Structures are given as C-alpha cells and as structure tokens.
Amino acid sequence: MYDLTGKHVCYVADCGGIALETSKVLMTKNIAKLAVLQSVENQPAIAQLQSIKHSTQIFFWTFDVTMARQEMKKYFDEVMVQMDYIDVLINGATLCDERNIDATINTNLTGMMNTVATVLPYMDRKMGGSGGLIVNVTSVIGLDPSPVFCAYSASKFGVIGFTRSLADPLYYTQNGVAVMAVCCGPTKVFVDRELNAFLEYGQTFADRLRCAPCQSTASCGQNIVTAIERSENGQIWIADKGGLEMVTLHWYWHMADQFLSYMQSTDDDNQEQFVSGRR
C-alpha cells in the first residue's frame, strides 16, 4: 500500500470533473501539500478543496500543458519554491477534439511527456530527490481501439506505451520513481460534452454516447486514489462502472525479452543469440 499521509502532491489537470473529485479524495488522505496546475483559474473549486482539510496547504498555478519544455522548466522552478519537493505527480490533462488532432495529441501525450521529463529531475534519487510516484490518468480506449475517437484513442495508447516504458526497472532501480496509469471508463463529465467523430461515418455513434450509461466523476475520482494507494511500479488499472480492475499486461513481440537482455548484456554469446533469434 502507498501511504499518502504527509505527501506533497502535484496535480496537472483542469480543476473540474474527474480532477476535482480526485482532489477531494486526496484531501481526506492527510496529504501535506497539493499543487493544482490547470489551464483556467477556478477559485470556488480551490476553496471547496481547502474546506475539506484546512491544514493541507493548497497552491494554484495557471498552467498550459502544451508549453515548450524550456518554459516548463522555468515554471516548475517556481512551483518547487512552494512545494519543496514532489512525492506524487498526477497527469490528468485531457482533450478529445477529433477536428484538432494537433491539440489532442499535444494535450494528451506530448504535454504529458514534457511534464514528466521536466518534473522527474526533482524527484530522481540520483539527482537529490526522494523518489516517488507518477500517475498518468488516461482512458480505456488507450487499451482498446475506438473507431469513433481515433485521434483521442491514439493519444491514449501513447500514454500507456510511455507509462510502461518509463516504468522499466532500467529507470526505476536508479531513480526510485514508480510510474503507473489509471484508465477511466466513460464518465459523465466526458459524455456531457459535444463530441465529434474522427470521420463522419462515426458521428451517429458519437451522438449516442450522450445517452450511454457511464460512471460518475465522484466514483472515478475515488477509484483513482484507491489505485494510487494500491499501486506498484508499472501497474495499469481500469476505473470503470464504479469498480477498479488491474490490467494483465502482455508482451506481443516474441523477442521483447531477448531484446531487453541484449540491451543489458555485454556477453557476446547473448548478443549473438538475439541477432540469430535463438533462445
């Protein structure tokens, strides 16, 4: 179990919907500090969070997840003055706009990766940090394809690939930063928006999604925090229909294990086995 007591948590997302409900639950876990980084100021939401736990320090910054990494570095230098250190980084910024592929990819994937690359040095044990946990909040259509929201699905598949890659022991054993993801199923705040399909053939299905059964943002937020508390490095969870399920991960490339051994080995025989395909 991952104990959130006394932790310094940084949440990159819009402070509404899933992010707000997740933050409400976090505030009941006796965290010491919560940094909320979002695109639009939402003081009523911040006040609502503060009312849950007065002793927890809450800091707010207006943040554009699509900014260049160089700008992010300057930004987080200021954030760290208030936070001192970050134990948990939660990436929850999301956009589903099939008519604006660049914005969808930049928000959901590129921006998230730049945020991680910027924050990791502050957490890295070999760079003076204390280790910690990175949580990427993503979607179930990052596990299974969506014929309706093709660009959104592609961006979320990228989040899963990035999460699994960064969770490799090659990194974790050195920097002490665990990486996990929570894939949210259809949630009310998402289906309430105007949604456009990637191609017009799918628009009927996009319109029907408004009436489809979906979980509440409160239920999803609760399960995101539960997944964090149960987390181990590299785990992928599904938060859907009020439940929580851990994903069984698979290696589809039959030489993946040999490739990793080859990367880590200086033995000529092992390298020859990889090239020849022998086990």
Swiss-Prot record:
Residues the record lists as binding NAD(+): 11-34
Catalytic residues identified in the record: Y152 (proton acceptor)
Keyword Oxidoreductase part of the UniProt annotation: yes
InterPro entries: ADH-rel, NAD(P)-bd_dom_sf, Sc_DH/Rdtase_CS, SDR_fam
Keyword Oxidoreductase recorded: yes
Domain of life: Eukaryota
Keywords for this protein: Oxidoreductase
Pfam families given in the database record: adh_short
Gene Ontology MF terms in the entry: oxidoreductase activity
An annotated GO cellular component: cytoplasm
Binding site for substrate: S139
Family, similarity comment: Belongs to the short-chain dehydrogenases/reductases (SDR) family.
UniProt-listed PANTHER family: 15-HYDROXYPROSTAGLANDIN DEHYDROGENASE [NAD(+)], ALCOHOL DEHYDROGENASE-RELATED
Protein name per the record: Alcohol dehydrogenase-related 31 kDa protein
Natural source organism: Drosophila guanche
